[in-house]
A protein has these predicted regions:
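Beta-strand-turn-beta hairpins that frame and shape the catalytic cleft
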Residues: 81-90, 173-176, 191-219, 338-340
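Solvent-exposed loop/turn segments at secondary-structure junctions
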Residues: 95-100, 127-132, 156-161, 173-176, ...
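Active-site beta-strand/loop signature of hydrolases that rely on acidic residues for catalysis
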Residues: 90-95, 112-136, 169, 216, ...
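Extracytoplasmic, non-cytosolic globular domains
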Residues: 199-277
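Acidic/histidine-rich helix-loop elements
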Residues: 87, 92-106
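Structured beta-strand-rich core segments of catalytic domains in phosphoester-bond hydrolases
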Residues: 70, 130-208
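Active-site neighborhood of phospho(di)ester-bond hydrolases with catalytic His/Asp-centered motifs
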Residues: 123-125, 152-155, 251-255, 272-276, ...
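Metal-dependent phosphoester-hydrolase catalytic domains
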Residues: 2-74, 240-248, 258-341
Length: 341
């Protein structure tokens, strides 16, 4: 016999499950803009902000877990889509002692070409001073695959005998930038070995008022055993927030040389899009990450991956280290401001 109440319960149950799934995996992350620092105007603790933070962390964990178990483990292949992606893929790549002769080695060239074409924007670390020829050659390699990329290169940074040059490459059909807004963070007290490189980007191809705009910071920190550069990240972020552009979406990409839970900034609402994934060829160390502020950068889609080029190219750990002591990695973001696709 038909029971209308039983049918109604099933419908309500299905609706509740669908709503919970949408909230967990699809809805933009929530933020309490009235009290952005977990404190009310009278100084008392804001439990609403605490609940929002906990909810956001749960949803990001759920999205990362889903992405991990549903993404293809197959290395980047020839059949992967090369056209405009609705999502923006931001990567970080550290190639030790990178210069033109090293870039031209077959396996290094293949890694940078393959990883380059799979990302819309890459923060590059490890390049030796005055090596813009590497960037020109890299762009030319991508152009042979009908991909239009540009680059931004910073000045040499570091101390005598220990210098680097940071750079970005970006998909010009997907992103625009303002070269006048490219700058190296000033460090008059010489507290950090390699001064971070800061750039501004906006997604192209959609209404500029709806396009995701953000600041990307390229950085390479020293091992915590030899310094306390990780403790400077909050001050670095604050300096960038006050640079006159009023950009709320700040993304830090590069080498942090420690697990995300050991980065003080990540105890204050920031998170690493790679979670606790190892990022060295031996899969023992947490060296690299992409950090975002979970309460302001709602555009993060909950997906971050490390490119295991050892498996992709059938290399030993020692062979891989000759290419890089770091594994490339990326995170995916919505192309639209606020995370709506």
């Amino acid at each position: 016999m038909f029971n209308p109440f039983s049918s109604t319960k099933r419908l309500l149950g299905t609706g509740a499950l669908l709503a919970a799934g949408w909230w967990t995996f699809l809805a933009p992350l929530e933020t309490d803009s009235a009290n952005p620092v977990n404190e009310t105007e009278n100084g008392s603790f804001d439990h609403k902000s605490e609940l929002l933070d906990n909810a956001n962390h749960f949803r990001l964990w759920a999205r990362q877990t889903l992405a991990h178990y549903t993404s293809s483990p197959t290395p980047f292949g020839e059949n992967e889509q090369k056209n405009f992606r609705p999502a923006l893929r931001i990567g970080t790549l550290h190639v030790n002692d990178l210069n033109l002769p090293k870039f031209q080695k077959e396996k290094v060239l293949f890694l940078m070409r393959e990883f380059g074409r799979q990302c819309d924007l890459i923060a590059l670390q490890g390049m030796e001073p005055n090596q813009q020829e590497v960037l020109v050659e890299w762009i030319a390699e991508l152009a042979q695959q009908n991909m239009d990329y540009g680059y931004l290169a910073g000045p040499n940074v570091g101390r005598a005998g220990q210098q680097r040059q940071f750079a970005f490459i970006y998909n010009k059909s997907k992103l625009e930038t303002d070269r006048t807004q490219l700058y190296t963070l000033k460090d008059p007290q010489d507290l950090i070995l390699f001064d971070p490189l800061v750039a501004w980007f906006r997604v192209r191809g959609i209404d500029p008022s709806r396009a995701f705009t953000f600041t990307l910071v390229n950085m390479e920190l020293s091992d915590p055993a030899f310094g306390k550069e990780q403790n400077l990240l909050e001050e670095i972020v604050q300096s960038i927030r006050n640079d006159g552009r009023r950009e709320d979406d700040i993304i830090l990409a590069g080498s942090f040389e420690c697990a995300v839970q050991n980065i003080p900034l990540c105890n204050d609402g920031w998170l690493g899009v790679l979670g606790d994934m190892p990022t060295d060829p031996s899969f023992q160390k947490r060296r690299d990450n992409i950090l975002i502020q979970s309460r302001t950068t709602e555009e993060f889609l909950g997906k971050g991956e490390v490119f295991d080029f050892l498996r992709a190219y059938n290399l030993t750990v020692q062979e891989a280290i000759q290419i890089s002591q770091h594994l490339p990695a990326w995170g995916e973001f919505s192309a639209l401001e606020g995370g709506f696709q």
